[in-house]
Amino acid sequence: AEAGAHVIVMARRKDQLDGVVAAMTDAGHSAEALVGNLADIEATSAAIDAIRPLDVFVNSAGMARHSPATETAADDFDAVMNVNLRGAYFASQAVAKAMIADGRPGSIINISSQMAVVGGVDRAVYCASKHAVEGFTKSMAIELGPHRIRVNTVCPTFIRTPLTEQTFSQPARVKWIEEKIKLGRVGEVEDIMGAVQFLA
């Protein structure tokens, strides 16, 4: 929004969306809310079709359920994969189809994770989902390049968001994380804004 784009924010909870959109419009930016759930593929596809044309799609939806690999429940596995992989894949597909149909160049940016390239204790399912995001992103980049559509990922380390709130409520865990990060601090959303804006 700060770069001058009209931003359409999509999430499941209207109350959260309204707060985000209000913050942007109060700052003089152009934004609107769209209630939806990436896990609902048909509804997401219809929503994307309704807001065409699109120039940039940033997929930042994510879910994490941590457990030892030997204790992962099938329901937890399915829930994480449904959002992080299935939802991301088919939303990217819908956006790509719309861009191709409209004859527009564009950019699809998937927010992945450092966990896409490293492992983590109690994070086997999350890591698997992000490895998969890296895989389909690379393939889509090759396939969609001829249509002038770029497809990339941004792979940050721990970023302070509602998704990581539980982790950061544990001081010992925060200390361990910060010792692993060369900057000596946990990342903030603002730290990845430049990369996203560049790729857009």
Regions inferred by a protein language model and the residue ranges of each:
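Substrate-binding pocket helix/loop in short-chain dehydrogenase/reductase
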Residues: 68-69, 76-78, 177
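Active-site loop immediately N-terminal to the catalytic Tyr-X3-Lys motif
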Residues: 70, 118-124, 146-147, 184
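Active-site helix of classical SDR
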Residues: 92, 129, 137
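Alpha-helical segment proximal to the catalytic Tyr-Lys
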Residues: 97, 142-146
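Residue(s) in the substrate-gating loop at a strand-loop-helix junction
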Residues: 113
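C-terminal helical subdomain
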Residues: 153, 175-200
